[in-house]
Amino acid sequence: MKRNPIEVFSEWADLNKDYGMEKNHENSVQNMLDFAIEDKLPFTFIDAGCGNGWVVRKVSKISNCTQAVGIDGSEKMILKARKIDPKLNYYCADIMSWAPKKKVDLVHSMEVFYYLEDPKKIIDNIYKNWLNQDGRLIFGIDFYEENKTSHDWSESCGIKNMKLLSEKEWLKFLKNSGFRNVKTWKCGAKKDWEGTLIISGKR
């Protein structure tokens, strides 16, 4: 029987599968950060769907990052993140409706948005309630229409409600929310693997 994503990822936290995700996603995340972080300009940062907090820890060490925050729907993942580094700020909440007390300059997410009931809603929420003017959203996904190898993941992982969308559909979500300078590219393509689809736009 398929389960909701929070249940599955909470179980993965117990089984330490989150460390495997960190290893598998590291190159794509670095590619996104290299693109999004402008040299020497101070910035604030949120990782949406932060898991065990590895990206938050990574970004917090960048000299011009003045604040790095993580949010995740899995209490077990957040507890793990806080245990690894109690000094950083982590929130366990529904990212569809949550909003930071103070807007930020950069929102990042890796392998999260297609698990949500309404991906367009989180993109709208980030645009309206998370980002400063000229702030940037950047996110990566491996489960998308053009990446045929990924199509059976909902069945093989036993996760319900996964949204299989095309690159054009994701682009449209950002543009319809108001994002400008929207662009996409792929990272890590190889035989039988289209690579991580990366999408970014500015508020």
Language-model features: locations:
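Conserved beta-strand signature within the Rossmann-like core of class I S-adenosyl-L-methionine
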Residues: 134-142
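A short glycine-rich, Lys/Arg-flanked "PGG" loop and its adjoining helix->strand segment in the class I
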Residues: 120-133
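Conserved class I S-adenosyl-L-methionine
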Residues: 1-38, 145-146
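Short alpha-helix
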Residues: 162-178
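Short, glycine-/aromatic-enriched active-site segment of Class I SAM-dependent methyltransferases
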Residues: 142-161
